[in-house]
């Protein structure tokens, strides 16, 4: 702004100097000399002020444009900073001193951590129970109960698998036993039916 003011004063001084130097009039116009000089000076001052105002407006517009451009640039930088993705987090690698575990070892370690966090027992724990004699696994490694021992013991009280034959069964396999269905004596009526010339009215 001070630069523009100095430029305007310089232009004004040059214009006034030219006006005083080139304003040579004859004696007839000597009375109006002061009026002509001031009129020309006023016109030149008006022109100089107009030029200075234009220059000032252009400078101000350029300055405003620069400020606007700087603000726009700062806004773009802020938006770019906001829109930029955060740097990737450093993932903990299982590689220690150049040693990288295999997928099987990684899965085994993951299963151990999972069981530790959830309180689950490994499968080998149950297998050890089953292999141990007298372990608490009633399905795979249990002591034989008394009923099973009775079934394999001769004369045990198991009536289905190992029981003594009843008297009725012994009578059925014994000839002449009192079983009327399997081993009985033929009645007189039956003997008459199979004997020729008997008075059986239904068969003869």
Curated annotation (Swiss-Prot):
Belongs to the CLV3/ESR signal peptide family. Residues 116-204 are annotated as: Disordered. This is CLAVATA3/ESR (CLE)-related protein 1. Residues 142-150, 163-171, 184-192 form a propeptide. The gene is CLE-1. Residues 21-83 are annotated as: Required for secretion from the host cytoplasm to the host apoplasm. It comes from the Eukaryota. Residues 139-151, 160-172, 181-193 have a biased composition (Basic and acidic residues). Glycans are attached at residue 32. Preprocessing of the precursor by host proteases leads first to the production of 21-mer CLE-containing peptides (Arg-130 to Lys-150, Arg-151 to Lys-171 and Arg-172 to Lys-192) followed by an ultimate C-term trimming to give the mature 12-mer CLE1-1 peptide. GO terms for cellular component: extracellular region; host cell cytoplasm; host extracellular space. The keyword Repeat applies. One of its GO terms (biological process) is cell differentiation. Keywords: Apoplast, Differentiation, Glycoprotein, Host cytoplasm, Repeat, Secreted, Signal. Residues 1-21 form the signal peptide. Highly expressed exclusively within the dorsal esophageal gland cell during syncytium formation in host plants.
């Amino acid at each position: 702004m001070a630069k523009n003011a100095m430029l305007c004063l310089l232009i004004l001084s040059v214009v006034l100097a030219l006006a005083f130097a080139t304003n040579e009039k004859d004696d007839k116009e000597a009375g109006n000399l002061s009026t002509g000089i001031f009129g020309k000076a006023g016109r030149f001052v008006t022109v100089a002020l107009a030029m200075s105002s234009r220059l000032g407006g252009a400078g101000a517009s350029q300055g405003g444009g620069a400020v606007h451009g700087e603000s726009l640039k700062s806004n773009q930088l802020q938006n770019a900073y906001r829109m930029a993705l955060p740097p990737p987090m450093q993932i903990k690698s299982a590689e220690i001193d150049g040693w990288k575990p295999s997928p099987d070892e990684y899965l085994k370690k993951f299963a151990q951590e999972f069981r530790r966090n959830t309180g689950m027992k490994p499968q080998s724990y149950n297998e050890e129970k089953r292999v141990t004699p007298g372990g608490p696994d009633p399905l795979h490694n249990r002591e034989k109960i008394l009923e099973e021992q009775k079934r394999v013991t001769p004369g045990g009280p198991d009536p289905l698998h190992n029981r003594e034959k009843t008297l009725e069964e012994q009578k059925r396999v014994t000839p002449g036993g009192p079983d009327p269905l399997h081993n009985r004596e033929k009645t007189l009526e039956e003997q008459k039916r199979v004997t020729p010339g008997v008075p059986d009215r239904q068969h003869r």
